[in-house]
Amino acid sequence: SVNQTAEEIVESFLLSQDNSLEKRKLKKIFEPQNVSDEYDFWISHTAKECKRNQFICFFIDQPTGYKENVSAELKKRFWMTPPYEDYTLSLDNLIQISSLYNNWLREYTINNNLNFCSLSEKLEPNTDNFFDDAHFSENGSKKVAKILSECVKFSIDLSII
């Protein structure tokens, strides 16, 4: 409806998509051992462009609700498991995949002397921080901004020394 608030629109969307871990009857297993070639390509390409142009770039991992200690309320809002499919992956698969990508990015930045900020371990997986699997609530966005500003400040302070 035209008079819906942004919060009501989001809630309406979540209710139509949510609880995919329980609602989708078809369960598939996907346990990649490496990040996708496309992800590797684009991260590498971005890093090369940063160095070539002498940009100060920051690489940031992706916080998600995919944690063992995810709140029951947030877990019911999961829909990106994957999105728009008739099947779901298990929470264990989702944890493994998100950890694989976040750990790969951390290692890549260390090995290539790039700035890295870790968010994934700093946001509790609950509805105070997330609307759903990976989208921040307003409060979560504020926490992300604070964490990132501290990370950038720390990195800049180190480069001055």
Predicted regions, residues:
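Serine-dependent acyl-ester chemistry module
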Residues: 1-106, 124-127
